[in-house]
A protein has these predicted regions:
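First transmembrane helix
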Residues: 17-45, 166-178
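N-terminal amphipathic/basic-hydrophobic helices that include classical n-h-c signal peptides
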Residues: 1-16
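C-terminal transmembrane-bundle signature of multipass membrane proteins
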Residues: 34, 173-247
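Membrane-proximal helix-loop-helix units in multi-pass membrane proteins
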Residues: 104-169
């Protein structure tokens, strides 16, 4: 058998395994969880507003991927889908974007963004928890395919679209502003590249299987996490906030 044909068969077999197993979302969850722990540790050692928000955002990413792994391995249900939709489709990118706001925007504006994010998190959580879920949408799912967005009713889709759009805008805008100002050029270039890779991963599912999404997310997460870690190591130009003295 020619080498090219043998390699094609191996690649096809590997893709078939990835398409029918929970390995891709599980590995994605582990990577996101490790990055979240790393960011939380950095926040504990040297606090900055962006760090805990990034840690929470990465933890939400891990929760969504873990729910997808569970749904793939044991079958999707109402609970696993709600967790997947809430943490992945609604909250994750918005919280990451709120963290980036503290690096790119004036502190007063970033605090407003933070307050709006908290309000949106509460609204989205309540909406997703009480929204009706069409269990019939889970019947024909195969491999790592996730349930369609139409499986959940109410106004959940509005929260998902709005929070994802604003969060992505904050992540991209924050990186671009810093690049233009030549502030933390390397870290912000990595953050921007990671966001683009994760976004493109969803687009590439049109040309390949759902496993393409998770493989793209793995790469994007590593690049995004590296950029965040790099930015934190470079430090912040702002002066530390003085402690509150209680008389």
């Amino acid at each position: 058998v020619p080498v090219s044909i043998r390699e094609a068969r191996i690649a096809g077999s590997l893709r078939a395994v990835l398409a029918d197993s929970a390995i891709p979302p599980l590995v994605t969850a582990l990577i996101a969880g490790a990055l979240a722990a790393r960011m939380a540790g950095s926040a504990a050692r040297s606090f900055a507003p962006s760090k805990p928000l990034w840690a929470i955002g990465l933890l939400l990413f891990a929760a969504a991927s873990a729910a997808a792994a569970y749904g793939t391995a044991d079958g999707w249900g109402s609970v696993s889908f709600r967790i997947y939709y809430l943490t992945g489709a609604c909250l994750c990118v918005a919280v990451l974007g709120a963290g980036s706001a503290f690096l790119a925007l004036p502190r007063a504006v970033a605090l407003v963004v933070f307050g709006m994010t908290i309000t949106a998190v509460i609204g989205a959580t309540v909406t997703v928890l009480i929204a009706p879920v069409d269990s019939a949408a889970f019947a024909d799912l195969q491999g790592v395919a996730a349930p369609p967005n139409s499986a959940i009713g109410g106004h959940a889709a509005i929260w998902a679209i709005g929070m994802n759009s604003v969060g992505t805008l904050l992540l991209v805008a924050g990186a671009l502003v810093s690049l233009v100002r030549r502030i933390r050029t390397g870290p912000n270039a990595a953050i921007l590249a990671g966001v683009i890779v994760i976004a493109l991963a969803g687009t590439l599912t049109r040309f390949g299987g759902q496993e393409t999404l998770y493989l793209g997310q793995m790469v994007g997460l590593i690049v995004l996490g590296a950029g965040m870690e790099w930015a934190n190591r470079r430090g912040h130009a702002r002066k530390p906030v003085p402690p509150i003295i209680v008389a």
